[in-house]
From Swiss-Prot:
GO terms for cellular component: cytosolic large ribosomal subunit. GO terms for biological process: translation. PANTHER family: 60S RIBOSOMAL PROTEIN L23A. Gene3D superfamilies: 3.30.70.330. Belongs to the universal ribosomal protein uL23 family. Keywords: Ribonucleoprotein, Ribosomal protein, RNA-binding, rRNA-binding. One of its GO terms (molecular function) is structural constituent of ribosome. Binds to 23S rRNA. One of the proteins that surrounds the polypeptide exit tunnel on the outside of the ribosome. Pfam families: Ribosomal_L23. This is Large ribosomal subunit protein uL23.
Amino acid sequence: MDPYKVIIRPLVTEKAVSLIERENKLTFIVDRRATKQDIKRAVEEMFNVKVAKVNTLVTMKGEKKAYVKLKPEYDASEIAARLGLF
């Protein structure tokens, strides 16, 4: 799957911001058909980082949400700043 079609948008909520600061995790709304491997590949390619782990869930609205944990040598707050989240 094309990386630019996998990630629909970053999610900016109070919980998402606290995850960036505390756990080095980014939160995205992604395509429902995307697998964890697709999401990992897309984030690594788009932001030039290494991903440690991806957790996904489908919300009550029917959107797929992905929590992407970055490896310790990368900073989620730096990526969030590049995206304009802060």
